[in-house]
Amino acid sequence: MSHPKLESSSNKEIITEEVGLLKQLLDEATQKLIGSESFDKIEKIVSLSLTDDYTGLKETISALSNEEMVIVSRYFSILPLLINISEDVDLAYEINYKNNLNQDYLGKLSTTIDVVAGHENAKDILEHVNVVPVLTAHPTQVQRKTVLELTSKIHDLLRKYRDVKAGIVNQEKWYADLRRYIGIIMQTDTIREKKLKVKNEITNVMEYYNRSLIKAVTKLTAEYKALAAKKGIHLENPKPLTMGMWIGGDRDGNPFVTAETLRLSAMVQSEVIINHYIEQLNELYRNMSLSINLTEVSPELVTLANQSQDNSVYRENEPYRKAFNFIQDKLVQTLLNLKVGSSPKEKFVSRQESSDIVGRYIKSHIAQVASDIQTEELPAYATAEEFKQDLLLVKQSLVQYGQDSLVDGELACLIQAVDIFGFYLATIDMRQDSSINEACVAELLKSANIVDDYSSLSEEEKCQLLLKELTEDPRTLSSTHAPKSELLQKELAIFQTARELKDQLGEDIINQHIISHTESVSDMFELAIMLKEVGLIDANQARIQIVPLFETIEDLDNSRDIMTQYLHYELVKKWIATNNNYQEIMLGYSDSNKDGGYLSSGWTLYKAQNELTKIGEENGIKITFFHGRGGTVGRGGGPSYEAITSQPFGSIKDRIRLTEQGEIIENKYGNQDAAYYNLEMLISASIDRMVTRMITNPNEIDNFRETMDGIVSESNAVYRNLVFDNPYFYDYFFEASPIKEVSSLNIGSRPAARKTITEISGLRAIPWVFSWSQNRIMFPGWYGVGSAFKHFIEQDEANLAKLQTMYQKWPFFNSLLSNVDMVLSKSNMNIALQYAQLAGSKEVRDVFNIILNEWQLTKDMILAIEQHDNLLEENPMLHASLDYRLPYFNVLNYVQIELIKRLRSNQLDEDYEKLIHITINGIATGLRNSG
């Protein structure tokens, strides 16, 4: 399906005006802080950057004192942030503009539904499609929450710029407000003084739900149903979008995730969504002032209204208001019942005195209701379904007496939200490394006198033993009297908490447990043993789905055999049957890329999906994929629409899950317009891939796949030859990148490595990619690509034409190359050379020459296959964006290099070390997808 891509703006000059205005105000704020003489140096640096005089730039920055570095770092870190805001505002305007004129754009939902409506299974497809963005707290989100709140205010003001130009909004006041917030942000710390805790990550992510996601998901779902209805397809209870969450449940490599953080995550989520419902009920209460003297109501509505404690004479004839009052009181009590307390009033008090993590979400309405309570026993909702039934009772009364139009709007949105979010908001995933599960199971088996050294058993022996425990003995292995290691106690506690939360908030609060580094069937049975210990799994059913994560090249290659064996067991089939016949498999993009390079990773993942989909079909099971993507191309990132539509045909049955990480969350969901558009695109792309076969000739696709096998083999060899076989590469990475400084940056609760780093394989994929972004090589997104294509073309001169055909006709290959094109455009080998000079020895510095040669070769090969003269020819919007943003954050690289030099030569006092973190922050902001 072909769609026009969104342009920068219907008015091409407006974004230039906005950026100019924001820069002017930043200049004013900076000059006010430091004076005209010092600001002259910033103006000189700006001039040098805009004329690409990098020799002069390097000399000027080297001459700056440490004190002068402070303001230069801050200025050039904030400027890209303001440019981002302008772009976001402009994109939102363009989306609304095209929607208002009924124009098409990439990912437009109405266009997708128009197409799918002609499909023979249209209703089934639209009823069951489910896209699940899963928000994670991987350490790539470098912005402080305070800064995000300030940028949100600037964003809201900039949205009014066109109205200011048209004279609709008072220019003087608007300008003063914008000046004030830019002045504040210039004087606000943009980096964290202390490392985030898990509880901070939880509350930070909740801000996106409050700010944009709840309303965007609800609105989009309602629009989805309405568009289908226009095509004569009446959907019963579609959930095209539901949300997922890793924060609080992902303990792989993060010792700070515990049973307490899991409970906190669930409780805060519940409070956020229930508070949203309370706010919506407030709106309904204010607006639904229908008098019984002027309209009829159903007997059921009267019964509901009469239970209200609102005895005001002014509302005795307003049954709808009284009904909403009663519903609201029950909902408030439901919220309070989540906290421990004896009497209703004590619960309110504990609510008000609770920690700021929870208290920030409780609105003043609760205190008001608390002061009016007269009874000791207040009703509460046991389930979200009970709450929904009361709302439907109101709806039915309105419809019964001809008030259909009043159902639309707030009431319909509220009912829709309850359907989507329940009382839990987002499903929390649990995740742990397979080695931890094995250690816990080994301890349990030894404690129960079953086997002394479980880990020494063969894979076959392990499976036989675990299968026997899972099918033949309903008793648990653990005993309350038996001593347990700290690790086992911690793991059992988090599983027990998961069960309690499912009992309290509903099954959907926790549905999956992911096993990192899944390498065998026994890895999955070991998790089952742990789940059995707390009653979450037995011989007939599983209340939590076991999700293997295949992440290295080797594990992905072995995934077919592992899953074939796993699905062979009748026990496993019973578990899957209780999950509506779905078996989820998570695919790791980050580790596979670090393991084998971009081409090898991408192709191995593609083949694995094909093979695993076939296994599912052979067993009558729906295999669904969870894509563990990051922000960068090196971690599976890139444009969302193309990423989804380039998946193998048939790999998306009706459900797809994908991680949204770090700064990508802010970029995609920082405001309601952006959230709506990006979520709309995810749904459209998933449906498009489900119904549209891009290549209809099976022989052609087989030929393309055979070609890729040969190309990837060469790419993998070239990549591993440098990364794992070159004796100087390790030192080059650690000396010619800011990896040490990135690892100390307070950007997440998770450590940068699972253990002390002595080799590349021990480093987490995220700081690995983040550091290559900082030194502007973007290594994980392209290295090995050029050599592989050159080798293939040298075998036969006709092979270039073959690659060009693959690029034109095969979405997977097109997306692969387009991502490399984008990454190359953001790299800068002149800057990378300056980082290389940081390395101590000539042998280590010479690694850069190997990288540079491959970079040039990759660029030449990509342009030849795309048949383009320049990079980004098919992405003019990004090209324009980089044109006006690159000069500014290129400055930050030179500042960072100089600061690292001073730090490593002991010329930078401890007080100034955080300047390096400011530059890291600014470069990540400018790139927009840093990790």
Curated annotation (Swiss-Prot):
A Pfam family per the record: PEPcase
GO BP term, pick one: carbon fixation
Function, as annotated: Forms oxaloacetate, a four-carbon dicarboxylic acid source for the tricarboxylic acid cycle.
UniProt entry keywords in alphabetical sequence: Carbon dioxide fixation, Lyase, Magnesium
Annotated catalysed reactions: oxaloacetate + phosphate = phosphoenolpyruvate + hydrogencarbonate
Cysteine disulfide links: none
PANTHER family assigned: PHOSPHOENOLPYRUVATE CARBOXYLASE
HAMAP family tied to this protein: PEPcase_type1
Residues forming the catalytic site: 138, 594
Family assignment from sequence similarity: Belongs to the PEPCase type 1 family.
The gene coding this protein: ppc
GO molecular function terms attached to this record: magnesium ion binding; phosphoenolpyruvate carboxylase activity
Species whose genome carries this gene: Streptococcus agalactiae serotype V (strain ATCC BAA-611 / 2603 V/R)
Cellular component GO terms held in the UniProt record: cytosol
Record-given protein name: Phosphoenolpyruvate carboxylase
Cofactor(s) needed: Mg(2+)
Keyword Lyase included in the entry's annotation: yes
E.C. code: 4.1.1.31
